[in-house]
Amino acid sequence: FGRVLSAKELPFAIKDGKLVETKHTPPVHWIYPLIFSDMSIGALSTRAWEAVALAVGYLNEKCGLPVRMSSGEGGMPVKLLESDYLKYFIIQIASGHFGWNRIIKAMPHMKTDPAGILIKIGQGAKPGDGGLLPEAKVAEHVQAIRGVPKATLASPPNHQGLYSIEESVQKMH
């Protein structure tokens, strides 16, 4: 509501020290989806990432809530790319370009389109520095998903070779 209505227009009021509804409001899933933001499979543990992914599928399929999850820049497991659940995921491409060869190879086998594609232009949390995934966290499955050797992985602060809007558009075609 805060993005659409001013504070005075919100359908809530405080009465006797409690927040009360002053008029009917639609359930949150009628308004917009809930999104689990960018968390790569390399940054989280595999089990944690897969647990969130399973929760996203469950909340959509069993509860009817429009929940989406962004893959983070580390790519996605092929079994998810080729599943019906891909429609709940936003595939991210970021400055490290990790996992994109695998995603491109999986495209002919995808049963559905992803919920979206997120193009991360720069590292917002670490502007000018980029990010590092320590070698210790680059397990075999991370190497397979990202198509990289076991080494510390650097994600540059921006897309190398993209210095203008025109260059960005050319890369997307």
Give the residues covered by each predicted segment.
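N-terminal capping/small domains of soluble enzymes
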Residues: F1-Q160, E167-M172
